[in-house]
Amino acid sequence: MRPIFLCGFMGCGKSTVGKILAKKMGCQCVDLDKYIEDTAGMSIPEIFDKYGEEHFRKLETEALAAFADIGGVVATGGGALLSEENGKVAKRSGMVVFIDTYFNTCYGRIKNDPNRPIAYNSTREELLERFDYRRPLYLAHSHYVISGGYPPIVIASKIQKLYKRFDFGQG
């Protein structure tokens, strides 16, 4: 099957929805951040501390390209589809869905998470600024937008229906 890439801000529900969706569709779900941690042999905070965000983004690009060829459901990291290159790869390879969740909801989920170095080391205002900057990029790199206000099972069902009628020639 062609991949389904889930994108959106940190804490929008990509990983949760991805697991449910993969189960419904009988395929694998890859959490891109988890894959990078497993491949690098260290946590994302350790990668950031040791090599910096730029190196992490390079690993993210490599992982995204690998899963573009494999398929399944890919829960991207919050910054994975910000680059033009990654956005094009994802749109060309599969179906991209932006889970559009209110900032306050995302913030409530991520504000104290030490495994999210950007969130953990940023103020609420800095994260809101990042959210506002990223949202138009998620929109530009997505085929579909689904409200993150629904329960995860509903979001997964909506994505499954979209996938069944998606025209893969439109990437």
Where are these regions (language model features)?
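Hydrophobic anchor at the beta1->P-loop junction of P-loop NTPases
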Residues: 6
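P-loop (Walker A) phosphate-binding loop of NTP-binding proteins
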Residues: 9
